[in-house]
């Protein structure tokens, strides 16, 4: 049951309209301090079993994994991305009026941070989740037999967000809208089109804009809208990760703390049959792609799935001789 303060907060949010400071209804004023969520996002150790992680994802749509990456790795990421932080934090809303002002966005992180690329290449939890949730196994029916075609998942986008004081909150939304995904209450966890992994580069709190999440919304009907009086707030320590399904309603919170910057690395994955949000073929320097493991080349779409024809070049798997293909392209 929502308490009277929460009801009052909801009423205030409903009647308060975006003013001239907010350029579009995709970016909104903060939720009043008087609102207190009814639920907290579940936290478990990153060493938890895959079964436990999947059970919480199935129930809530998202889960916090503590100590997901080391502080040393985060320090190295900061060092690698430092040259890309010279740009001033945006004074205007960007990315189609969906990334708020006072937010610095660093795109294409695989090509800019070897540490992030290594996390993607070696993290066993991410690897297991990709196989269970997004690996596509399809029974292809031929005239006289049936074959199982396997399509590997892809890295859809990899971005860093440095969110400064005054950055507005996002309207509640689902990430899989970019794929025109349709939702059903009975969707199974291995039927969603994607999932995300937020890495906390700083301590994340409600006050500095921790993501608003509606637990259980991954099981809603497609047309149901999220309301501010339904949200919980993402709060986690540096090094933790928030794993959530692309069907979960959420939105970045409002950073209310002067002088504080919230840092998030956003790793988003999708089915290999979908178009990625970020064009990895043009985001990652060829010098780095050529040195990557087959697993990373697969995740970025440079390697043809073993059980499919997707991604061919000259009727072949491009990963057989990527260097020769690059040379031919440059002629």
From Swiss-Prot:
Keywords: Dioxygenase, Iron, Metal-binding, Oxidoreductase
Compositionally skewed regions (Polar residues) per UniProt: 1-11
Disruption phenotype: Abolishes the production of swainsonine as well as of the 1,2-dihydroxyindolizine epimers intermediates.
EC numbers on record: 1.14.11.-
Superkingdom of the organism of origin: Eukaryota
Pathway in which this enzyme or protein is active: Mycotoxin biosynthesis
UniProt keyword NAD, yes or no: no
Keyword Oxidoreductase recorded: yes
Spans annotated as Disordered: 1-31
Composition skew (Basic and acidic residues), residue ranges: 13-23
Entry GO MF terms: dioxygenase activity; metal ion binding
Named cofactor requirement(s): Fe cation
Binding site for Fe cation: 173, 175, 250
Function, in words: Dioxygenase; part of the gene cluster that mediates the biosynthesis of swainsonine (SW), a cytotoxic fungal alkaloid and a potential cancer therapy drug. Swainsonine production occurs via a multibranched pathway and is dispensable for fungal colonization of plants and infection of insect hosts. The first step of swainsonine biosynthesis is the production of the precursor pipecolic acid (PA) via conversion of L-lysine (Lys) to 1-piperideine-6-carboxylate (P6C) by the aminotransferase swnA, the latter being further reduced to PA by the reductase swnR.
Oligomeric and partner information: Homodimer.
Similarity-based family: Belongs to the PhyH family.
Protein name (record): Dioxygenase swnH2
Source organism: Metarhizium robertsii (strain ARSEF 23 / ATCC MYA-3075)
Record lineage: Eukaryota, Fungi, Dikarya, Ascomycota, Pezizomycotina
Gene: swnH2
């Amino acid at each position: 049951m929502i308490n009277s303060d929460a009801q009052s907060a909801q009423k205030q949010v409903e009647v308060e309209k975006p003013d001239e400071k907010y350029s579009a209804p995709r970016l909104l004023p903060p939720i009043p301090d008087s609102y207190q969520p009814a639920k907290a996002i579940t936290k478990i150790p990153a060493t938890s079993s895959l079964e436990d992680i999947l059970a919480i994802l199935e129930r809530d749509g998202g889960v916090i994994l503590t100590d997901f990456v080391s502080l040393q790795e985060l320090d190295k990421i900061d060092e690698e991305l430092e040259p890309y932080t010279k740009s001033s934090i945006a004074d205007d809303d960007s990315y189609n009026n969906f990334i708020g002002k006072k937010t610095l966005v660093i795109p294409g992180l695989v090509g800019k941070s070897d540490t992030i690329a290594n996390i993607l290449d070696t993290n066993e939890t991410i690897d297991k989740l990709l196989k269970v949730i997004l690996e596509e196994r399809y029974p292809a029916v031929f005239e006289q037999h049936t074959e199982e075609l396997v399509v590997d998942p892809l890295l859809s986008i990899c971005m860093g967000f440095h969110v400064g004081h005054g950055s507005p909150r996002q309207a509640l939304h689902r990430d899989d809208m970019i794929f025109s995904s349709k939702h059903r209450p009975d969707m199974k966890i291995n039927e969603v089109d994607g999932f995300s992994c937020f890495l906390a580069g700083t301590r994340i709190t409600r006050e500095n804009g921790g993501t608003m999440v509606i637990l259980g919304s991954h099981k809603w009907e497609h047309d149901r809208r999220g309301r501010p009086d339904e949200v919980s707030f993402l709060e986690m320590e540096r090094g933790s990760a928030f794993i959530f399904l692309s069907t979960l309603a959420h939105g970045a919170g409002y950073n209310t703390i002067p002088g504080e910057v919230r840092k998030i690395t956003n790793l988003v994955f999708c089915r290999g049959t979908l178009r990625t949000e970020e064009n990895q073929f043009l985001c990652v320097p060829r010098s780095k792609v050529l040195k990557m493991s087959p697993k990373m080349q697969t995740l970025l779409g440079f390697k043809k799935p073993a059980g499919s024809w997707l991604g061919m070049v000259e009727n072949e798997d491009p990963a057989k001789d990527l260097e020769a293909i690059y040379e031919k392209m440059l002629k």
